[in-house]
């Protein structure tokens, strides 16, 4: 799962920085 999220994260940031920030928060919560 982590690898998939890591691959999609840069794409989200590229399309929308705001969405990228949310994605980072979700990843942090998932890993935490």
UniProtKB/Swiss-Prot annotation:
The keyword Signal does not apply. There is a cross-link at residues 11-17 (Cyclopeptide (Val-Pro)). One of its GO terms (molecular function) is toxin activity. Residues 1-10, 18-32 form a propeptide. Keywords: Toxin. Belongs to the MSDIN fungal toxin family. InterPro entries: Amanitin/phalloidin. Probable toxin that belongs to the MSDIN-like toxin family responsible for a large number of food poisoning cases and deaths. It comes from Amanita fuligineoides. This is MSDIN-like toxin proprotein 3. Processed by the macrocyclase-peptidase enzyme POPB to yield a toxic cyclic heptapeptide. POPB first removes 10 residues from the N-terminus. Conformational trapping of the remaining peptide forces the enzyme to release this intermediate rather than proceed to macrocyclization. The enzyme rebinds the remaining peptide in a different conformation and catalyzes macrocyclization of the N-terminal 7 residues.
